[in-house]
Each structure stands twice: as structure tokens, then as C-alpha cells.
From Swiss-Prot:
Induction remark: By infection.
Any Gene Ontology CC annotation: extracellular region
Domain of life of the native organism: Eukaryota
Name of the gene encoding the protein in the UniProt record: BG06
Main location as per UniProt: secreted
Record-level Gene Ontology MF annotations: carbohydrate binding
Organism expressing this protein natively: Biomphalaria glabrata
The name this protein goes by in its record: Hemolymph 65 kDa lectin BG06
Subcellular location: Secreted
Keywords: Lectin, Secreted
Amino acid sequence: FFTTFDKDNDDQQNDN
């Protein structure tokens, strides 16, 4: 997911 849905972890926005 390249979206910034995980605003809490902006550092890991591209986790997948």
C-alpha cells in the first residue's frame, strides 16, 4: 500500500 493510511508510521508508509 503506497497510500499514507498509516499516518502514525509515516516512516513506514510503504510497508508492503
